[in-house]
Amino acid sequence: GLLASLGKVLGGYLAEKLKPK
């Protein structure tokens, strides 16, 4: 569903932000 898709996108975004560079 739409919410599931948004959750995946948001989760990926947070993972990238929290990932140490």
Curated annotation (Swiss-Prot):
Biological process terms in GO annotation: defense response; negative regulation of nitric-oxide synthase activity
Taxonomic path: Eukaryota, Metazoa, Chordata, Craniata, Vertebrata
Tissue: Expressed by the skin dorsal glands.
Main location: secreted
Any one cellular-component term (Gene Ontology): extracellular region
Protein name: Dahlein-5.5
Cell compartment(s), UniProt: Secreted
Organism domain of life: Eukaryota
GO molecular function, one term: nitric-oxide synthase regulator activity
Species whose genome carries this gene: Ranoidea dahlii
